[in-house]
Amino acid sequence: NGWNENKNFILLGAVTWAILVFIVGSLNSYVI
């Protein structure tokens, strides 16, 4: 049960980072 929660947390973190990187990349390309 603990492993399942940890895996979900890691997956959520990966998705969050992917979205942040995408937003930052879009802002940089827009500014430049």
Swiss-Prot record:
Annotated membrane topology: Multi-pass membrane protein
Where's it found, cell-wise?
Plastid, Chloroplast thylakoid membrane
Gene Ontology, cellular component aspect:
chloroplast thylakoid membrane; photosystem II reaction center
Cystines in this chain: none
GO terms under biological process: photosynthesis; photosystem II stabilization
Q: Which UniProt keywords apply?
A: Chloroplast, Membrane, Photosynthesis, Photosystem II, Plastid, Reaction center, Thylakoid, Transmembrane, Transmembrane helix
Q: Where does the chain cross the membrane?
A: 9-31
Q: According to its UniProt record, where is this protein mainly located? A: plastid
What does the UniProt function comment say about this protein? May control the interaction of photosystem II (PSII) cores with the light-harvesting antenna, regulates electron flow through the 2 photosystem reaction centers. PSII is a light-driven water plastoquinone oxidoreductase, using light energy to abstract electrons from H(2)O, generating a proton gradient subsequently used for ATP formation.
The subunit structure is: PSII is composed of 1 copy each of membrane proteins PsbA, PsbB, PsbC, PsbD, PsbE, PsbF, PsbH, PsbI, PsbJ, PsbK, PsbL, PsbM, PsbT, PsbY, PsbZ, Psb30/Ycf12, at least 3 peripheral proteins of the oxygen-evolving complex and a large number of cofactors. It forms dimeric complexes.
- Protein name listed in UniProt: Photosystem II reaction center protein Z
